[in-house]
Amino acid sequence: MDVRITIETTFDNGEKRTHQLDGISRPYRVTCPDGIGLRLEDGKRVVEQIQRAILCDQVEEIIRESRVCPDCASVRAIHDYRTRDLDTLFGRVRVKAARLRRCSCDARSAAMPGGPISPLAYFFPDRATPELQRLHAELGSRHSFREAARLMKSFLPCHPPHHTTVRDRLGRVAAGLEKSRRASGDPAEALPKG
């Protein structure tokens, strides 16, 4: 038996794109009990390919939509392209990300001086999805950092994290939670300690 996996993306503008992923082969005559169904390695590979197809299409759409200036609706020029490695729960994906020139009408140019705009930086400020960062923080708070990295490598197709990456992301998530708690004026902070 051969299984083919195809993904079809329909963009907001109506354009359609088809991605052909790797197939899975399970010949009947050589099937053993271990070869029944989808194995962990097969699942990790397929999910990683699905993630790559979806993320690349999303990045393309983000860049296309970001080219339109929000102030005057003119199309901003592309400054250059850079490759970015984006860490997701289902794998590390290398994408080609455009940086855009600032529009001449941009009223915020004085407030935000600088060169090209990277639309991808808004969605991936740490080049990792928030879901992956939360999982690193969750596992890092429950296990040693090395064990958390080992667990992720065993069960997920994501790029195997180094234990220091788990530690650093736990620290950033904790700092973000602390910052949002202080900004909300948490009454628990006003209570006397001890």
Predicted stretch roles:
Residues 1-104, 110:
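Short, conserved DNA-binding cores of transcription-related domains
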Residues 92-193:
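Short, positively charged, Gly/Tyr-enriched micro-motifs
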